[in-house]
Amino acid sequence: HNDFKLDNIMWSNSNPFDPVAVFDWDMCTRGDPLMDLGHMLNYWIDETDDEDCKLITSMPVTTISYPRREEIIGYYAMKTGFNVDNINWYYAFGAFKLAVILQQIFYRYQKGQTQDRRFSNFGKRVNALINRANNIF
C-alpha cells in the first residue's frame, strides 16, 4: 500500500476493530510488506514520545484504547508470521521516507504553490522525523 495509517482505513460500524476498506492507493507499490508496518509506526505516537515526535502526526493513538508501538509489532508478527527482528530498519526507513514526502509539501507551501495552513509546521515535522530515524538505532 505504501501509506498505511488509521485515516486510510474504513472500519466496520458493528466492530471497530474490523477493517472493511483501505483508501489512498495513489502511492501503492509492490514490495516488502514490512515497509507498510515501518511506515505506519511513524504515524503511531506513544504517550512517552517527546514533543517533537508528537508533531509528526495527528493520529489519536495516545488514548488508552490504542496499543503501543511494541504491541502493534508483536501483533503484526503473530498475525502474519513474519519475522520482525529487523523492524527498526523499516521504522527508520519509513521515517526518512515520510520526511522526504513532507519536505516536498513544505517546499510547495513556502513557495506559495499551496495555501493549506496545515503545512506551515511541516518543516518542524521533517526535522523531527530525521531525528527519529537517526535515533532509532
Predicted regions and their residues:
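Conserved NTP-binding catalytic cores of kinases and kinase-like/nucleotidyltransferase enzymes
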Residues: M10-A21, L55, T80-D85, F119
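All-alpha amphipathic helical-bundle segments outside canonical DNA-binding/catalytic cores
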Residues: F82-G94
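Short amphipathic alpha-helical segments and their helix-coil junctions
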Residues: D18, V22-D26, R68-F82, A128-N131
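A generic short alpha-helical patch detector that favors 3-5-residue windows
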Residues: T29, I64-R68, R125
